[in-house]
Regions:
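Conserved GNAT acetyl-CoA-binding A-motif
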Residues: 124-125, 152-164
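Conserved acetyl-CoA-binding loop-helix of GNAT-fold acetyltransferases
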Residues: 132, 138-151, 173
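Conserved active-site alpha-helix within GNAT-family acetyltransferase domains
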Residues: 143, 164-181
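Active-site rim helix/loop that mediates acceptor-substrate recognition in acyltransferases
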Residues: 34-55, 60, 69
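Conserved acyl-donor/pantetheine-binding loop and adjacent beta-alpha core of acyl/acetyltransferases
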Residues: 74-125, 186-189
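A short beta-loop-alpha structural element at the N-terminal edge
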Residues: 3-19
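Conserved beta-strand in the GNAT
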Residues: 57, 63-72, 126-131
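C-terminal "cap" of GNAT-fold acetyltransferases
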Residues: 161-165, 184-201
Length: 201
């Protein structure tokens, strides 16, 4: 019988975590350039790791199969190497010089607008980054990660950002509600809807 263990993520698994996130969040739909895709998935994971206070990993018979990062008020942020911090700083400057700045800016503005409306609810935490191995759907890996957060942070009001390119329906099945939604048009046929979801754990 397979054994699923939820514990603090091993740093050696961060690269695999970025792969799971890129697949689950369909990053490849934004670019066909493999170098840009690799750099962006590393940037996304690193920038969200830096702001997190909880970094859980899921291990199925010892194999890394998923993760959940979160941030809660009053808790210290996780330790992050100076090299990873430097990478985020450099990546942000490079993004500013590329054609992706407009798209990323529009996405971020949509999230900021929703949060400004939501902030009066006084959230105590945020699920910052969350993905599982897409090849292992149906094994309740994502559910177990969320259950671990609920167990440790019962009755806390949390929120998260997601979009229509992701499996946001998963969260709705787990008790999250849609607080806000914003359409984002990247030009041409490329568009999506950003969501802010919230729940009391």
């Amino acid at each position: 019988m397979e054994k699923l263990t939820i514990r603090s993520i091993d740093r050696k698994d961060l690269n695999k975590a970025s792969e799971f996130a890129a697949q689950g969040m369909n990053y490849s739909s934004y670019t066909e350039n493999p170098i840009v895709l690799y750099l962006y998935r590393q940037y996304a994971l690193s920038s969200l790791l830096i702001k997190s206070t909880v970094t859980l990993g899921a291990y199925l018979d010892g194999q890394f199969v998923g993760f959940l990062f979160a941030r809660f008020d009053g808790e210290p942020k996780v330790s992050v190497s100076w090299g990873r911090r430097l990478f985020v700083t450099v990546a942000e400057k490079l993004i500013g010089l590329t054609g992706y700045q407009g798209a990323i800016g529009a996405y971020d503005r949509a999230n900021q607008e929703m949060y400004q409306e939501f902030a009066t609810n006084r959230p105590e935490g945020e699920v910052t980054y969350f993905a599982v191995d897409p090849a292992l759907k149906g094994k309740r890996i994502g559910s177990r990660l969320l259950e671990e957060i609920k167990k440790n942070y019962k009755n806390k009001r949390v929120y998260l950002y997601t979009d229509s390119n992701c499996n946001y329906q998963f969260y709705l099945k787990k008790g999250f509600d849609i607080f806000g939604r914003r359409p984002v048009d990247f030009g041409g046929e490329d568009s999506l809807t950003c969501f802010l979801l919230s729940a009391i754990l």
